[in-house]
């Protein structure tokens, strides 16, 4: 009765089973995986949000497939901060970047076609690809967060079914950032191979090393390119369900992509009308919130580095952006066993394979939790790592 594409293995893993048991016992661990700003004490002023929402007619509905013109005009103005000079007509609104991925897979791929994606990356991407009957092929990211892509390796992963390359910059969870030289080389490769470039930039507002924040849309090239962002990360408003895709490249391909995207979007009409009407006010009022988030990320990153013992067998990997930190363990470590031991010690982190890291040495934690909780969790983490890694 059901499609093969939805026949996912839903068996709970050891980590989720142990976590559920602890929660039932009333002893939940310190959560170092939390990525909701509001849950981490970084929410918005409710009076400000109410003033934005209260200033609009909530019952009004004027559907426009690519999004309301005023919202797209506001985005075009705001993206100037990140170096992009776009017309409002080059921007398409959706309910989320996840939805935008699905639209772009539909736009670019027939069933069975392939898309190149970075590893490590989002756990969600394989599900989105399967729902679109698209095959993902992984290429490795540099460990150096400002390091150059190996385009020979990337190209070797492709075949005649490849239609696009996905890059997340800053990458989640490693914090790798696409530099201008790499973008130019990748643009040339995509143009030569007739591939599209999909740039996921949901963390672009949060650089932590290297040059200031800049979108790939600031450097249009010869390849058809899509740059994705959304209110979930850029403004800490995941519940508002609004994201945007900037479309750039040679005019014929760009305009054809927008015309087809308009039909795809018209079939869904998913972007929230109240969120679209509120968007201009959100964009002009969110800078203080971004500053608070950036300060939290920096503070917790410093805490993590400072609390690592000098002789520890594990390392904190360098990062150039985003909300996560990655720990590298000795090569032979069973990171799932380490995560289970940490749960028993009262702290929750994520094993690397969840993000398509190679098995055996990687852990991921969020840098968003409140500083006191984060410091306590890292202290427990360091003690558990010392005990587990020393046998």
Residue ranges: model-predicted function:
Residues 59-188, 204-219, 226, 374, ...:
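Conserved core of the PLP fold type I
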Residues 132, 192-193, 345, 388:
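Helix C-cap/helix->beta junction micro-motif
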Residues 85, 155, 333, 343-350, ...:
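PLP-dependent enzyme catalytic core of the Aspartate aminotransferase-like
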């Amino acid at each position: 009765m059901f499609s093969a594409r939805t026949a996912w293995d839903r068996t709970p893993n050891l980590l989720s089973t142990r976590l559920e048991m602890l929660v039932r016992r009333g002893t939940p661990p310190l959560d170092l995986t939390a990525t909701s700003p509001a849950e981490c004490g970084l929410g918005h002023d409710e009076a400000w949000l109410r003033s934005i929402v209260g200033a609009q007619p909530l019952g009004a509905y004027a559907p426009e497939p690519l999004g309301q013109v005023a919202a797209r005009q506001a985005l075009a103005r705001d993206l100037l901060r990140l170096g992009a000079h776009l017309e409002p007509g080059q921007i398409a609104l959706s309910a989320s970047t996840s939805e935008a991925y699905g639209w772009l897979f539909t736009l670019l791929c027939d069933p069975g076609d392939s898309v190149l994606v970075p590893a490590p990356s989002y756990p969600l991407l394989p599900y989105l690809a399967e729902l679109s009957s698209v095959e993902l092929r992984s290429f490795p990211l540099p460990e150096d967060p400002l390091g150059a892509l190996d385009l020979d390796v990337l190209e070797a992963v492709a075949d005649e079914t490849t239609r696009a390359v996905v890059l997340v910059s800053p990458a989640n969870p490693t914090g790798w950032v696409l530099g201008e030289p790499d973008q130019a080389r990748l643009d040339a490769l995509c143009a030569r191979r007739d591939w599209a470039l999909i740039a996921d930039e949901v963390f672009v507002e949060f650089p932590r090393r290297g040059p200031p924040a800049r979108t790939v849309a600031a450097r249009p090239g010869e390849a058809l390119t899509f740059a994705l962002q959304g209110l979930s990360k850029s403004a800490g408003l995941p519940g508002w369900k609004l994201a945007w895709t900037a479309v750039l490249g040679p005019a014929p391909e760009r305009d054809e992509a927008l015309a087809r995207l308009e039909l795809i979007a018209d079939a869904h009409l998913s972007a929230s009308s109240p969120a679209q009407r509120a968007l201009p006010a959100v964009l002009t009022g969110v800078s203080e919130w971004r500053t608070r988030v950036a300060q939290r990320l920096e503070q917790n990153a410093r805490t993590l580095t400072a609390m690592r013992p000098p002789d520890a067998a594990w390392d904190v990997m360098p990062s150039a952006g985003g909300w996560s930190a990655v720990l590298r363990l000795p090569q032979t470590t069973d990171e799932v066993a380490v995560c289970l031991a940490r749960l028993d010690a009262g702290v929750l982190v994520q094993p690397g394979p969840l993000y398509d890291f190679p098995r055996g040495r990687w852990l991921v934690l969020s840098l968003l939790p409140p500083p006191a909780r984060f410091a306590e969790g890292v202290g427990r983490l360091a003690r558990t790592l010392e005990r587990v890694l020393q046998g």
